[in-house]
Amino acid sequence: MRLVWFRNDLRCHGHTPLTQALAGGDAVTALHILCPDQWDAHGVAPARRWFVLHSLLELGESLAARGVDLHVLDGGDFDGSVTALENFVAEQGVTEVFCNREYPLNELNRDRAVARRLEAQGVRIHGFDDGVLVPPRALHTGKGTPYTVFTAYRKRWDVWMDDLQPEAVPAPDWPGGQGRFVGRERVERALETLSVPDSVTALWHPGEDAARGQLKDFVEQHLGDYKARRDFPAEPGTSGLSAALSAGTLAPLDAYLAARPALQDAKAREGAATWIGELAWRDFYRQIMHRFPSLATGAPFRPETALLQWSDNEEHFQAWCEGRTGYPLVDAAMRQLVQTGWMHNRLRMLTAMFLTKHLFIDWRKGERFFMAHLVDGDFAANNGGWQWSASTGTDAAPYFRVSVSYTHLTLPTIY
C-alpha cells in the first residue's frame, strides 16, 4: 500500500507525490491530519483555517470521484500527528509514503520524527518540493553561503528557471471507480468551531477549482498590466492568489507556467516578469526561513537589532490594531485586514513601518497580529515582510526609510 500524505498542498493538479504514488500500480490511499492545537500555537487566523478546511472538503470529494480514498485524522499538534501517522501506516499496511517537503522549523522537526519512526519499520518516504519553484538549498553564492539579498538571488533564480525549463507535473493515472472520504465529519466539526465574518466568506473562494479559474482569469485579463497597477491599493491590480498558494490549492509551478508564455509578448512581458518576480520572492523567503531556523523562534535576522528598545505603549498598539490611529490610510488598511482577512502588499509595508518606525513598537507584535487575521497567512512571507519593514531582516529596508502614510499640515493624534 502506498500513502499520499497531504499537508499544505490541497490539490490534485501539479502534485508530484500523487502522480508518483499512482504510477506504481500498487494500491494508493491518501491522508490529511488535522492539527488544531498546532494552529493555536502558531496563531493561525480563523480565516485561514476556514479556507484550508473548505479546501480539504473539496479535495476529499475530488479524490473520491477519481477512485482514491482520503482519510482525515485528528492529531492535535505535530507531536500527535507523528503518532497518528505511525498508527495509520501500521493499520493500513503502508510500505511507502509520498509527500511534499515543508520547510519551517516545527514542520522539519515533525518530519524528522516521522522519518525515524517509519524507516525503523521499513517504510520508505519519498519527499518532493512542489511547494516552491527552486528548493531552499539549491542556490548558493560563490562562497557557498545562502543568498541574503533578493536582487542577487533573483538573478540566480532566473538562470535556474531558464536552464531547467520546467514542465507541468503529469496528470495522475487515476484508478477509477468511487473512493471514500473517511473523516469528512471531522472537517465539518472543525468548521463549526470557527467564527469567521461574512465579509471574509463572501470574498474568498477556497479549493483547487476556484484557484485554477482565478489564475486563468488573471493571466488572460490582468497579467500584462500587473507592473503598472500592482502598487495602487485602490485598484484590483493584484492576482488575489496568495491564499491559494498558501494553502496549496494552486501549485507555484502551475502559476509560473501560466505566466511564462507572456514573457515572449512585447505588451505583456513587463507585467509577467514582475509577477513571476513575486514567485521568486516567495522562494527567497522560504530559503531564508529554512537556512536560518532561529527566525522561527522570534529572533531578528540581524542579531544586532535584538538590542533595540521597543515601546510597550499598549494604547498605541491597540489603536493600530483597531484602525484608530488617526492616519486615514493606515486605519483603512487595518480595518480591511480585520474585515476581509487580506491587505494589499503596499499597505502591509506601510502599516508595518508605521507600527515599528512611527510608534516604535516591536515588529513581532505586528507579525503575530497579521497572522491572527490573514487568510493567506504564511510564516516565511509574513516574517520576511515584517523584518524587512522594521529593518531587522534580510535585504531590509534602511532604518531611516519610512513610508509616507499621511500628508497634512496638522499631524493627527492617536485616540
Map each language-model feature to its residues:
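Secondary-structure transition/capping motifs at alpha-helix termini
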Residues: 120, 262-268, 295, 340-343, ...
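Active/binding-pocket-proximal capping segment
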Residues: 296, 302-307, 349-394
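Single conserved hydrophobic/aromatic residue that forms the stacking wall/gate
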Residues: 408-415
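Alpha-helical scaffolds flanking conserved acidic
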Residues: 270-275, 345-350, 365
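C-terminal substrate/ligand-recognition segments
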Residues: 286, 321-361
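Aromatic-anchored, charged helix-turn/loop surface patch used as a conserved interaction hotspot
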Residues: 59, 282, 286-330
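Trp/Phe/Arg-rich N-terminal binding region typifying the photolyase-homology
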Residues: 1-164, 335, 381
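Glycine/tryptophan-enriched, flexible segments
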Residues: 123, 144-300, 409
